[in-house]
Amino acid sequence: MASLNENQKFWARVTELAQQSIGKQAYDFFIEPAQLMSVEQDTANILLDSGMKKDYWKKQSDLITTAGFEVFGRMIDYELYANDELTELELHRLNNQSSIEEQPRSTAKPASPLVSGLNEKYNFENFVQGPGNRWTLAAAIAVADKPGDTYNPLFIYGGAGLGKTHLMHAIGNQILTDNPTARIKYVSSENFVNDYVNATRKNQMENFENTYRNLDLLLLDDVQFFSDKEGTKNEFFNTFNALYDKGSQIVLTSDRIPQELNNLEDRLVSRFSWGLTTDITAPDYETRMAILLIKSESSRLEFPSETLSYIAGQIDSNVRELEGALNRVEFVARANGIAVVDIETASQALRSLKNATQQSLSNLTIKKIQDEVANYYHISFSDLVGPKRPKEIAFPRQIAMYLVRELLGTSLPAIGTAFGGRDHTTVMYAYKQISDKMKNDMDVQKDIDSIKRKF
């Protein structure tokens, strides 16, 4: 095994060569997050933050070869690992055999005795607050302040890309800052299952239980993907009970409320509801603008407010797609040598995204929207389009009219015809009612978002 000093020199040379040969954005995205875990038997073990980056790294053999000959005087091969592909046991093994120390960073947190999987870049300070996440953010801060005491478990639900995972990491990072010896683990439900299956296959259940049942904080992401296998569910049930009984904090996320998790048993679902269940909805216009302003500040390009306003008006689904849209606009601007990004450039960059959205809705019909709304509110199709006017029917009818107008752009008279021959002024009133509610009524925002996701 190479000495610690040699390993540090080797990795420093790899990164130096990379900085000299590739652009800053590529370096920051592909190279900077990578870690050298060890050099064993002429093989460098490199840990990436995502398996999606392996293809890029496979093309960087010249970096490894050159640095290997310069530092070790011999040929060095390399093996790639990825955080999102490794089981906890494998990652723990890699860390234990690691022979290179982390370089000190001003923002680094003291290491936890257990590999936590936390991402340092997610904290409460850089989480943008808005009407759709205000109460969930408050709950997350309360949990981080008094883990195991305030809301346990904390169950956060909402659509993809709205910030659920960000808040999970923020909770973990805050607790780790306050208590550097805290035993914290962030894991997806899929990786929990993988850890359990591997532990069972390798007869290492004692290690698995020690890993999970002695935590101070368990952050379990995307529980809707939990396996329906009996053994896995039993193990998680026992893990949940063990942690809860000893006062450890549990935070869970899902794309739906606990009662809609059909792959889980009632006994688990009921436990998810013991603490606080809270949701995150799509960001409103002001929140989207705030997110874009913050993100654009780190760009070398200038984004006038009217350009950011245009982008915010085009992307209203979730934060992830909003950030992706900004990145795409920046890429197009750089490719065309544009320093001050105008609306025309943004429109050009986002044209293909809008076309893709339109294509995904090309098979959507008025009838499909009506059926989905009727199903969502548990009323019949005939009541939805019929003459009945009680609130529990009139409100879903207004929602359906709003969605038809919003998603399909159907004319007001045509919508009226599809809803039992109603006058176009009735449709106009319904559309205005729901449009007004969408500005400040979180329940309506949540309903619209949930129904849209069905499409």
Swiss-Prot record:
<dbReference type="GO" id="GO:0008289">
    <property type="term" value="F:lipid binding"/>
</dbReference>
<feature type="region of interest" description="Domain I, interacts with DnaA modulators">
    <location>
        <begin position="1"/>
        <end position="77"/>
    </location>
</feature>
<keyword id="KW-0238">DNA-binding</keyword>
<dbReference type="Pfam" id="PF00308">
    <property type="entry name" value="Bac_DnaA"/>
</dbReference>
<dbReference type="InterPro" id="IPR001957">
    <property type="entry name" value="Chromosome_initiator_DnaA"/>
</dbReference>
<feature type="binding site">
    <location>
        <position position="163"/>
    </location>
    <ligand>
        <name>ATP</name>
    </ligand>
</feature>
<dbReference type="InterPro" id="IPR003593">
    <property type="entry name" value="AAA+_ATPase"/>
</dbReference>
<comment type="subunit">
    <text>Oligomerizes as a right-handed, spiral filament on DNA at oriC.</text>
</comment>
<feature type="region of interest" description="Domain III, AAA+ region">
    <location>
        <begin position="117"/>
        <end position="333"/>
    </location>
</feature>
<dbReference type="GO" id="GO:0006275">
    <property type="term" value="P:regulation of DNA replication"/>
</dbReference>
<keyword id="KW-0963">Cytoplasm</keyword>
<dbReference type="GO" id="GO:0005524">
    <property type="term" value="F:ATP binding"/>
</dbReference>
<keyword id="KW-0446">Lipid-binding</keyword>
<dbReference type="InterPro" id="IPR027417">
    <property type="entry name" value="P-loop_NTPase"/>
</dbReference>
<dbReference type="GO" id="GO:0006270">
    <property type="term" value="P:DNA replication initiation"/>
</dbReference>
<keyword id="KW-0067">ATP-binding</keyword>
<feature type="region of interest" description="Domain II">
    <location>
        <begin position="77"/>
        <end position="116"/>
    </location>
</feature>
<feature type="binding site">
    <location>
        <position position="164"/>
    </location>
    <ligand>
        <name>ATP</name>
    </ligand>
</feature>
<dbReference type="InterPro" id="IPR013317">
    <property type="entry name" value="DnaA_dom"/>
</dbReference>
<dbReference type="GO" id="GO:0005886">
    <property type="term" value="C:plasma membrane"/>
</dbReference>
<dbReference type="GO" id="GO:0016887">
    <property type="term" value="F:ATP hydrolysis activity"/>
</dbReference>
<dbReference type="InterPro" id="IPR038454">
    <property type="entry name" value="DnaA_N_sf"/>
</dbReference>
<keyword id="KW-0235">DNA replication</keyword>
<feature type="binding site">
    <location>
        <position position="165"/>
    </location>
    <ligand>
        <name>ATP</name>
    </ligand>
</feature>
<comment type="function">
    <text>Plays an essential role in the initiation and regulation of chromosomal replication. ATP-DnaA binds to the origin of replication (oriC) to initiate formation of the DNA replication initiation complex once per cell cycle. Binds the DnaA box (a 9 base pair repeat at the origin) and separates the double-stranded (ds)DNA. Forms a right-handed helical filament on oriC DNA; dsDNA binds to the exterior of the filament while single-stranded (ss)DNA is stabiized in the filament's interior.</text>
</comment>
<comment type="similarity">
    <text>Belongs to the DnaA family.</text>
</comment>
<dbReference type="Pfam" id="PF08299">
    <property type="entry name" value="Bac_DnaA_C"/>
</dbReference>
<feature type="binding site">
    <location>
        <position position="161"/>
    </location>
    <ligand>
        <name>ATP</name>
    </ligand>
</feature>
<dbReference type="InterPro" id="IPR018312">
    <property type="entry name" value="Chromosome_initiator_DnaA_CS"/>
</dbReference>
<feature type="region of interest" description="Domain IV, binds dsDNA">
    <location>
        <begin position="334"/>
        <end position="455"/>
    </location>
</feature>
<dbReference type="InterPro" id="IPR010921">
    <property type="entry name" value="Trp_repressor/repl_initiator"/>
</dbReference>
<keyword id="KW-0547">Nucleotide-binding</keyword>
<dbReference type="InterPro" id="IPR020591">
    <property type="entry name" value="Chromosome_initiator_DnaA-like"/>
</dbReference>
<dbReference type="GO" id="GO:0003688">
    <property type="term" value="F:DNA replication origin binding"/>
</dbReference>
<dbReference type="GO" id="GO:0005737">
    <property type="term" value="C:cytoplasm"/>
</dbReference>
<dbReference type="InterPro" id="IPR013159">
    <property type="entry name" value="DnaA_C"/>
</dbReference>
<protein>
    <recommendedName>
        <fullName>Chromosomal replication initiator protein DnaA</fullName>
    </recommendedName>
</protein>
